[in-house]
């Protein structure tokens, strides 16, 4: 969407997605099996409007894009490397230059009883571990990293719904208020693709404070 706007092909693009009843049923089945009430009883959805630069609103930096190619493999370290550390390194940035990361933002109150653990926390631990390996972070700061650069998951766990984008409204407000400068949104993982091919898919991008001088979506 940002590329379409930045190219001038379109002035405004709406990115819209809805939840999935099949995933809702899968989670509910796991909860009932453990004698719990069905904790996820709603369909998620979101819509994001991407439009031309107004010189004020946060922008998407199209120079910092992470991609997960087939050759990357499915190992967690390889996935996070291709989506997080690689694009940052290409642009002369460290992991610690990003104020917040928004990976798979599933609500742990829902995923833990279903046996999937705390998904956002697992992602933050991997990002922090890679940052230590790259020399961007001290090992003693690993625990602090997840608090300072992460969010607690709050989104419904339906496929693409929690994958990065739930933070966008909150992040926009925080950047406008001067509380944040750069945030990386990470969309990754596909349950069904993974089960069929043992592969992942994914993309990441950075939302940042308006640069003013540059034309950006």
Give residue spans per PLM region.
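Active-site-proximal alpha-helical scaffold in enzymes
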Residues: 1-11, 50, 158-178
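Residues that mark the start of a beta-strand
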Residues: 10-12, 97, 181-182
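Short beta-strand segments
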Residues: 13-19, 183-188
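Active-site-adjacent elements of ketosynthase-type condensing enzymes
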Residues: 21-33, 165-169
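Flexible loop/turn segments at secondary-structure boundaries
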Residues: 22-23, 108-111, 191-195
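Condensing-enzyme catalytic core mediating Claisen C-C bond formation in acyl metabolism
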Residues: 30-103, 109-112, 128-137, 142-151, ...
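C-terminal transmembrane helix-loop-helix hairpin of multi-pass membrane proteins
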Residues: 114-117, 121, 128, 153-162
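Hydrophobic alpha/beta core scaffold segments
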Residues: 166-172, 178-186, 190-196
């Amino acid at each position: 969407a940002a590329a379409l706007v930045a190219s001038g092909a379109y002035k405004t693009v709406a990115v819209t997605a809805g939840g999935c009843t099949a995933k809702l049923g899968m989670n509910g089945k796991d909860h009932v099996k453990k004698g719990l009430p069905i904790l996820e009883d709603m369909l998620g959805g979101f819509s994001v409007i991407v439009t031309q630069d107004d010189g004020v609103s946060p922008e998407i930096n199209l120079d910092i894009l992470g991609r997960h190619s087939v050759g990357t493999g499915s190992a967690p370290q390889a996935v996070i490397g291709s989506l997080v550390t690689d694009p940052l390194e290409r642009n002369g940035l460290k992991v610690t230059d990003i104020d917040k990361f928004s990976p798979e933002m599933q609500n742990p109150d829902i995923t833990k009883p279903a046996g999937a653990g705390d998904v956002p926390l697992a992602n933050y631990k991997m990002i922090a571990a890679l940052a230590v390996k790259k020399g961007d972070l001290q090992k003693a700061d690993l625990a602090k990293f997840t608090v300072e650069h992460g969010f607690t998951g709050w989104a419904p766990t339906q496929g693409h719904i929690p994958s990065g984008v739930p933070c966008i409204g909150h992040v926009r407000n925080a950047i406008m208020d001067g509380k944040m400068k750069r945030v990386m949104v990470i969309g990754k993982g596909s349950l069904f693709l993974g089960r069929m091919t043992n592969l992942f898919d994914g993309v990441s991008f950075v939302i940042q404070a308006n640069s003013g001088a540059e034309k950006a979506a």
